[in-house]
C-alpha cells in the first residue's frame, strides 16, 4: 500500500523535537539520514551521532490527515526558530525498504588486492583479500573518501609481520584490513565502548584469531607502539593529539593520517613535522591523506 512521507531538513539539535512531533502526529516510523552524504565520525561517550544537516523522515498511513499534521509541524518549527522550514510531503509506493537499503551497498575495491564486501553480497574475487563488513550508523565502511584513502594506502604497503594501531578505530575496518593484508596483530584505540564491540564483532566475522587483536579505551599503557599507525579522525583532534599519536609509532615506522580537508592539511603537517618526514599527501574529493615516516 502507499504511504504518506514527510521529510524535514534540520540541524542535529532540532532532530529530537521533530522526531517527537512526527511520532505524536501518528508516524509509523521515523528515520534519520544525511542531507549531503557527509560522514558521521565516531561519537563521544553517551551521545547519538548525527550529521551537521540531518533529514528527518516520517512515514504515515496514506490516509493520514495532512491538513492537521502540517500546521503542527510548522508550529514546532517556529518554536525552534525555524521560520522557513525545509519540508517535503509526498505519497510513496510501498516497497521492500530493507531490500532497497541493502541493494545500495556493493563490494568495493581498494588498491590492487583489497575488497570490502557486505555480508549479503557474493565475494567478487575469491583470490583477493576480502574484508566482510556491513554498513552501520557511526562507523566507517569504506564508502567515505577518508576511509578509502587509508584502505588504499594499507593495500599499497607491506603489512606482512608488522604491528598496526588503528587510532579512533570505530568499526575496526582499517586495523582488520591490515591484519588481512598480513600484519601480525593490531590494537584499536577509541573513546567509545561501542567501538570495542563493533571491532571485535567485525574481527570475528572475518575469522580473525582473537589473540591477534585488542581494542583499548584510554588510558592505555605508555609504552604502546606499532610499526604502522593509522588515524582517520578529524584535523583538529589530529593536530591536538600529535604528541600522543606520534609516540605510538616506532622509530622508522609509518603513519597515515586522514579525516582532513585539503585546506587543513598544512596545519596537520606542521603539527607532526617534529617527529616525521612527510612522504606523501594524497587528495580524494577534497579530503587528504598524509603519510609520514618517523625519524630514527
Swiss-Prot record:
It is an enzyme of class 2 (transferase). One of its GO terms (molecular function) is protein-lysine N-methyltransferase activity. S-adenosyl-L-methionine binds at residues 147, 168, 190, 232. It comes from the Bacteria. It holds the Pfam family PrmA. GO terms for cellular component: cytosol. It is found in: Cytoplasm. Its EC number is 2.1.1.-. Methylates ribosomal protein L11. Belongs to the methyltransferase superfamily. PrmA family. This is Ribosomal protein L11 methyltransferase.
Amino acid at each position: 500500500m502507499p504511504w504518506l512521507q514527510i521529510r524535514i531538513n534540520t540541524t542535529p539539535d532540532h532532530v529530537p523535537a521533530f522526531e517527537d512531533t512526527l511520532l505524536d502526529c501518528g508516524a509509523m516510523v521515523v528515520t534519520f539520514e544525511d542531507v549531503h552524504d557527509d560522514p558521521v565520525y565516531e561519537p563521544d561517550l553517551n551521545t547519538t551521532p548525527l550529521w551537521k544537516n540531518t533529514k528527518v523522515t516520517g512515514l504515515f498511513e496514506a490516509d493520514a490527515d495532512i491538513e492537521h499534521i502540517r500546521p503542527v509541524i510548522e508550529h514546532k518549527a517556529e518554536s525552534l526558530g525555524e521560520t522557513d522550514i525545509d519540508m517535503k510531503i509526498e505519497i510513496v509506493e510501498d516497497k521492500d525498504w530493507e531490500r532497497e537499503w541493502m541493494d545500495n551497498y556493493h563490494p568495493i575495491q581498494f588498491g590492487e588486492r583489497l575488497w570490502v564486501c557486505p555480508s549479503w553480497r557474493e565475494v567478487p574475487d575469491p583470490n583477493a583479500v576480502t574484508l566482510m563488513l556491513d554498513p552501520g550508523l557511526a562507523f566507517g565502511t569504506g564508502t567515505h573518501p577518508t576511509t578509502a584513502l587509508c584502505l588504499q594506502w594499507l593495500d599499497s604497503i607491506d603489512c606482512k609481520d608488522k604491528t598496526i594501531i588503528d587510532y579512533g578505530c570505530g568499526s575496526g575496518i582499517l586495523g582488520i584490513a591490515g591484519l588481512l593484508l598480513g600484519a601480525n596483530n593490531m590494537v584499536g584505540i577509541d573513546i567509545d565502548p561501542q567501538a570495542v564491540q563493533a571491532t571485535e564483532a567485525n574481527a570475528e566475522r572475518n575469522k580473525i584469531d582473537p589473540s591477534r587483536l585488542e581494542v583499548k579505551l584510554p588510558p592505555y599503557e605508555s609504552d604502546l607502539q606499532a610499526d604502522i599507525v593509522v588515524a582517520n579522525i578529524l584535523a583538529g583532534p589530529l593536530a591536538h593529539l600529535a604528541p600522543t599519536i606520534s609516540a605510538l609509532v616506532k622509530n622508522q615506522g609509518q603513519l597515515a593520517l586522514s579525516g582532513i580537508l585539503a585546506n587543513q592539511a598544512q596545519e596537520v603537517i606542521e603539527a607532526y613535522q617534529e617527529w616525521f618526514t612527510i612522504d606523501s599527501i594524497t587528495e580524494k574529493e577534497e579530503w587528504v591523506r598524509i603519510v609520514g615516516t618517523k625519524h630514527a
